[in-house]
Amino acid sequence: VCLKALSKNIKDLNNFILIGDIEHFRSLNNGLKLDLNFDLEKKTKNTVKVFQIPLSERVKLGMPSLKNAKYTLDVLLEASLGTLEKRYSAMITGPINKSIINEYGFEFSGHTEFLADISNTKNVVMLLANKALKVALATTHLPLKDVAAKITSQRLEKYLKILNNELKSKWKIKNPKICVLGLNPHAGENGFLGTEETLSLIHI
């Protein structure tokens, strides 16, 4: 996905740095029949600069390897620290296999929690956004059976305040209008299909 996106924006290649194994990128590039060039040192007109982090084992697409769990973490760590240290202006992440990271021995539930921890950020809200719609999540990376217990009045109030402030400051929305979705079918039907709305959502 990353290489295909870059191939469609050739004029912007110099704005990006890929973090990972350069030979892996070259292999993908050849397999996809794209026309990208990669370099470890310089950025030229049609070249993508790569910050080299070597794979432990050659990648087999669709078959995540425990041997490459550390590689995945190292890539994420370099991108995160580089952004915090302002060596990079921003970071773009793709999906990663959480199971092999946890099997490797590193407790990992998702990018959101990882970034909050590494940046020492206590309160964090995940926001999915495009030009038409912005969706904030009240919980992240939890088994479904644990979700309802996490949605409390205190948690919602905290998240809504963060969201309201961010919409004003970063998105320049003067008076944000925030809709809170119900947890149960038909928002609980006044308690007949669940009580989370009457106990938490409506109160907030």
Regions from the PLM with identified roles:
Residues 127-128, 172:
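Short beta-strand
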Residues 1-111, 154-201:
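Contiguous, glycine/small-aliphatic-enriched amphipathic segments in soluble metabolic enzymes
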Residues 112-117:
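A glycine-rich helix N-cap at a beta->alpha junction
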Residues 128-159:
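Ligand-binding beta-strand-loop-alpha-helix segment within the catalytic cores
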Residues 119-122:
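Phosphate-binding loop that captures ATP/GTP phosphates
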